[in-house]
Amino acid sequence: MTDITANVVVSNPRPIFTESRSFKAVANGKIYIGQIDTDPVNPANQIPVYIENEDGSHVQITQPLIINAAGKIVYNGQLVKIVTVQGHSMAIYDANGSQVDYIANVLKYDPDQYSIEADKKFKYSVKLSDYPTLQDAASAAVDGLLIDRDYNFYGGETVDFGGKVLTIECKAKFIGDGNLIFTKLGKGSRIAGVFMESTTTPWVIKPWTDDNQWLTDAAAVVATLKQSKTDGYQPTVSDYVKFPGIETLLPPNAKGQNITSTLEIRECIGVEVHRASGLMAGFLFRGCHFCKMVDANNPSGGKDGIITFENLSGDWGKGNYVIGGRTSYGSVSSAQFLRNNGGFERDGGVIGFTSYRAGESGVKTWQGTVGSTTSRNYNLQFRDSVVIYPVWDGFDLGADTDMNPELDRPGDYPITQYPLHQLPLNHLIDNLLVRGALGVGFGMDGKGMYVSNITVEDCAGSGAYLLTHESVFTNIAIIDTNTKDFQANQIYISGACRVNGLRLIGIRSTDGQGLTIDAPNSTVSGITGMVDPSRINVANLAEEGLGNIRANSFGYDSAAIKLRIHKLSKTLDSGALYSHINGGAGSGSAYTQLTAISGSTPDAVSLKVNHKDCRGAEIPFVPDIASDDFIKDSSCFLPYWENNSTSLKALVKKPNGELVRLTLATL
């Protein structure tokens, strides 16, 4: 019998079948096996029992079972191993027909049997190898299903689990092109170790060198073309934009491919997928709620997104998460959301996840309209995650499209209520790292959000592209971005936002295009790093000094605090405060110089205190007659020269504001 999963051994909780209050064997006795908590002597309560042969095959036998003089079960006089398919009750009768023992549930008494049953309940009760199709196995499963052989599916194959709560343990692969669809999995179901692999090996590109340098020339990218499931991604129309000219260079068999082996969880609630892996793999949660992708085991993505939560019809998705794990490659984004809303509790999003070499963005919230409805997302979490070397962007968390703005938002807030890029997305965003993006490191839009602890490193394009309004950014580090010197700013903020703590340590010079900071409507504070002031464009640069401030100079004879007003000049300092050594190191003397720009010459006018250790002040005089409006404040005087520098005079403003002129000396 090949369709039996008999794995519960029929045995007495005692070593041999004995009478319940003695060590005497029940010689020539009989055993009846039935359902738990029933009388197994009644045929209506009995369950099938089998002899298990050495080759693992099973032969069903009739009851009662016979006990020999030694207290062991025999069949036709031979010792045999008897098994059944489930927990059971047991009644034992002696040779005279008297009941000597009754056990309502053997599992309560036998730790070994309990372990077998517990293992079955928490792992599987049905093996795929015992059934011709996955649907047959799913229909037979009670509480679990073991995928113990490779299963070849056809695209669109649908498996209906009938609402059962199952643990599906995968020890083998699902192989096929297209979607394998799981429906009606009960709330609390768990799929562990699933491995999806395409039948077809696609043509892939990898626009980087062996030493991980980006390739941007179309011909160089096409030169990397090869068939592989493990090293690259299938080119898409996005690559036609990223690498101009590549479309005409690619051979026909590398265009329009759509090779993905996708496990689709359709319209389920509370299903978790753990330790998923695969080659050309995808995992699509369509119309799902409170579902989780947990600890992805580095699946290599196919043509579609690797992990997708899509709720374009029905209710907005809620409670859907990517938690932990890592993915590689894929032609689209590693983790993406379409029309999800986590509500005020921010129930949903990405936590503790790593994306490597995504063909588009590492983590993406879709923007704009898809079909006839919005694909935008609200109230999600994006925390503690890393995106490494994506072909496009690291984290793309926008809602409105930028390149082709829509006139309205079907199924969403109208433009009249929330203008372009000003939706109340309310995402919780904290502790994200992007390294080496060929596009933008971190991008988003929206209004009224708080974003903290973002680090972007070594990106070819902008470090941060923020179409945000009235939002607060705290602890943002942009390090060595716009390395390809694109027509891009290292940081761009469109609306009136506040940036508190902007670290720019290690910024590479970008002598070609773009500013270091372009935030024409924002207030920025806490900038650190070697930043060229001419590359800063902000509405307000606020650096409040709390307590004592000290400017230290190491290895130089001077310390300086320099001032620059960009409305006056983006390249020249408007004023400065210097401290210079009098004499050499250790002289114990210095002088202080206060300067101002004049005639487009910085430091043209200066006041010096203690120059040459004189213990006095060097005051500049106006070189010609001073006009009355030269002096600004009362109780002040302004020295000036008159009569071809032969008469030294002073313009004095008395405490009452009256002006008088005094002759100090005639030469």
Swiss-Prot record:
Q: Name one GO cellular component term.
A: virus tail, fiber
Under the heading InterPro entries, the entry gives: Autotransporter_pectin_lyase_C (IPR012332), P22_tailspike_C (IPR015331), P22_tailspike_N (IPR009093), P22_tailspike_N_sf (IPR036730), Pectin_lyase_fold/virulence (IPR011050)
Give the annotated active site: E360, D393, D396
Which keywords has UniProt assigned to this entry?
Degradation of host cell envelope components during virus entry, Degradation of host lipopolysaccharides during virus entry, Glycosidase, Host-virus interaction, Hydrolase, Late protein, Viral attachment to host adhesion receptor, Viral attachment to host cell, Viral tail fiber protein, Viral tail protein, Virion, Virus entry into host cell
Tell me yes or no: is Hydrolase among this UniProt entry's keywords.
Answer: yes
Q: What is its EC number?
A: 3.2.1.-
Localization recorded for this chain is:
Virion
Q: Which SUPFAM superfamilies match?
A: Head-binding domain of phage P22 tailspike protein, Pectin lyase-like
Which GO molecular function annotations are given, in alphabetical order?
endo-1,3-alpha-L-rhamnosidase activity
Q: Please state the protein's primary subcellular location.
A: virion
One Pfam match, by short name?
A: PhageP22-tail
Q: Which domain of life is it from?
A: Viruses
Q: Which GO terms describe its biological process?
A: adhesion receptor-mediated virion attachment to host cell; symbiont entry into host; symbiont entry into host cell via disruption of host cell envelope; symbiont entry into host cell via disruption of host cell envelope lipopolysaccharide; virion attachment to host cell
Reproduce the free-text note on domains from the UniProt record: The interdigitation of the polypeptide chains at the C-termini is important to protrimer formation in the folding pathway and to thermostability of the mature protein.
Briefly state the protein's biological role: Structural component of the short non-contractile tail. The tail comprises six spikes that mediate primary attachment to the host cell lipopolysaccharides (LPS) and display endorhamnosidase enzymatic activity, hydrolyzing the alpha-1,3-O-glycosidic linkage between rhamnose and galactose of the O-antigen polysaccharide. Digestion of the LPS brings the capsid near the cell outer membrane.
Family, similarity comment: Belongs to the P22likevirus tail fiber protein family.
User: How does this chain assemble?
Assistant: Homotrimer. Interacts with the host O-antigen lipopolysaccharides; this interaction induces cleavage of host O-antigen. Interacts with tail hub protein gp10; this interaction anchors 6 fibers onto the tail hub hexamer.
Specify the protein name.
Answer: Tail spike protein
Specify the species.
Salmonella phage P22 (Bacteriophage P22)
Gene expressing this chain = 9
